[in-house]
């Protein structure tokens, strides 16, 4: 997140967290991991049990909408990743707020713009009508 601080407290399970340039850390129930705005990071379920966390992001801006749509698309697409059209749309529209570090630069700079154009021509984005406007950095 370019504009938000984020914090997660583990309720159940074990979370793995990685900040770019650092070693991974692992946290269990009652422990908290915090990421500062602009800090490239990722986190994952690092255990065998279900991971349940309580967290916050400040200021929230469009985080809830963005994550809800990414997860909705991922679920509809078989659970591995959002559809190419949804991924291209969401990462392009909200690029001032969020970045998904797992997507190669070539895909973001070349493939996504082509996919976005094809999606617009094919009418793939009608479900995003009324989506909140991105926050300007």
How would you name each of these model-derived features?
Residues 2-4, 9, 16-137:
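Jelly-roll (double-stranded beta-helix
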